Design a protein with these regions (language model features):
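A conserved acidic beta->alpha catalytic loop
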Residues: 26-35, 83-84
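Short beta-strand/loop segment that forms part of the nucleotide-sugar
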Residues: 16-29, 49
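Acceptor/aglycone-binding surface of glycosyltransferases and processive sugar-polymer synthases
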Residues: 46, 50-52, 56-67, 87-161, ...
């Protein structure tokens, strides 16, 4: 974290840095700080401490909600503290925001430095996301939010589960700028394979209503294909080209699979529609329950 603050001091444009405050969300870290923060050339550093670890997506939602209520500002930059979101790219986000004011600006990763295995599964994740939701996701958390959109965003319940997915779901205007992913300043990622899968699924779950309908449509199409295959099998049986017992067994098996697929898909759609009638978690209202304290460092 100290390395990141030092890079912010040196890499962020002076006219931006002079009016910048840093809010660090401490999601109940198990590691105590032993060294003080370095001198910050901006306005101040604040640490928002949470009662428990909720995961980085919910930490982002809480941090944004706190800023929206307590810290008047023109723009908010969301970034990870590991250095992979490079501070010098903040200048790029500000430049793009000046071109398209009123939109959330995301950093679209033009190049990544992770292992081949990670990059392979990341491509798989983007493909599955596109297939299930019909939308493309080419960005992560690194972004710039104008004040006007911040007030909209913290009232979007879906950002509690996944920040980028919540923005897509909310239909708040957003844009992207190609930025190369940086390298970690220190240490290694604590996210394991299971955590990465859960993170990917959480993004898809934000758009579960669209996903459920697309699965139902796919099930109906597959049912049509199965019925066509059954008709072909019955035709072969009628003309005597089918092995005795084979046609009946295959037809009944395909029919059972078709019915199960259709009913499960239909049940999923009804579950989603029922969920939409429930009262949802609104970060702007409920974030206070998780805030332990706020400390101003400098």
């Amino acid at each position: 974290l100290n390395l990141l603050i030092e890079k912010i001091n040196t890499d962020v444009a002076s006219e931006i840095l002079a009016t910048t405050s840093v809010l660090i969300v401490d999601d109940c870290s198990s590691i105590d700080r032993t060294t003080p923060f370095p001198a910050f050339k901006g306005k101040c550093i604040q640490v928002l401490r949470l009662y428990r670890n909720l995961g980085h997506q919910r930490a982002i939602a809480i941090g944004l909600s706190y800023i929206a209520e307590k810290l008047p500002c023109d723009k908010v930059v969301v970034m990870d503290a590991d250095g992979e979101d490079a501070p010098n790219d903040i200048n790029t986000l500000f430049a793009r925001s000046a071109q398209v004011p009123g939109k959330i600006i995301f950093a679209e990763r033009s190049k990544r430095h992770e292992s081949f295995l990670f990059r392979f599964f990341y491509v798989v994740y983007k493909s599955v996301f596109k297939l299930l939701t019909g939308k493309a996701i080419t960005f992560g958390n690194f972004s710039l939010i104008p004040q006007r959109r911040l007030q909209n965003l913290v009232r979007v319940s879906e950002i509690w589960n996944n920040y980028p997915g919540g923005v897509i779901r909310s239909r708040i205007p957003y844009d992207g700028v190609a930025i190369e992913r940086g390298k970690r300043l220190a240490g290694s990622s604590k996210m394991n394979f299971v955590s990465l899968i859960l993170h990917g699924l959480s993004a898809i779950s934000v758009l579960i209503d669209t996903t459920a309908v697309r699965i139902l449509i796919s099930s109906i199409i597959m049912s049509g294909v199965v019925l066509a295959v059954i008709c072909i099998i019955l035709f072969l049986k009628l003309i005597g080209n089918a092995t005795p017992g084979w046609a009946s067994m295959l037809s009944s098996t395909l029919l059972i699979v078709m019915m199960q697929s259709f009913l499960i898909s239909l049940f999923m759609v009804f579950m989603v529609l029922q969920y939409r009638t429930q009262q949802h978690f609104i970060p702007a209202i409920h974030y206070r329950d998780f805030v332990e304290s706020v400390e101003t460092i400098a």
